[in-house]
Regions:
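A short, exposed loop/beta-hairpin motif centered on an aromatic-Gly-Thr core
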Residues: 21-31
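Short, charged, surface-exposed hinge/linker loops at domain edges
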Residues: 1-6, 31-74
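Extended rod-forming repeat segments used as scaffolds/tethers
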Residues: 13, 27-29, 49
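Generic structural signal for short, solvent-exposed loop/turn connectors between secondary structure elements
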Residues: 1, 20-21
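Short acidic, gly/pro-rich beta-turn/loop elements at beta-sheet edges
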Residues: 15-17, 26, 35
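Short aromatic-glycine-(Arg/Gly/Cys) micro-motifs in beta-strand/loop hairpins
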Residues: 8-20
Length: 74
């Protein structure tokens, strides 16, 4: 089973929101977020996992890229 999550930084915490499942979690760091997300998904899909089905998490993130003008040599 493939479950998609959007991750984003809300200014204080890293957050993960399920796009296919009613799951939300957060962490102070990306590592903490990933650990919390794994635990939340395992609990949410406990019956699925107990039936021997595998769970795959697809993590989606948006990154802003701004144009930085090249340094003009004088």
């Amino acid at each position: 089973m493939l479950v998609k999550f959007e991750i984003y930084f809300d200014g204080e915490f890293w957050c993960a929101r399920g796009l296919d499942a009613d799951i939300f979690t957060q962490g102070e760091t990306l590592d903490e977020l990933m650990s919390n997300l794994r635990e939340a998904a395992e609990l949410h899909f406990e019956e699925t996992l107990n039936r021997g089905q595998s769970l795959h998490l697809l993590i989606l993130s948006e990154m802003e890229v701004s144009h930085v003008p090249a340094f003009a040599a004088g």
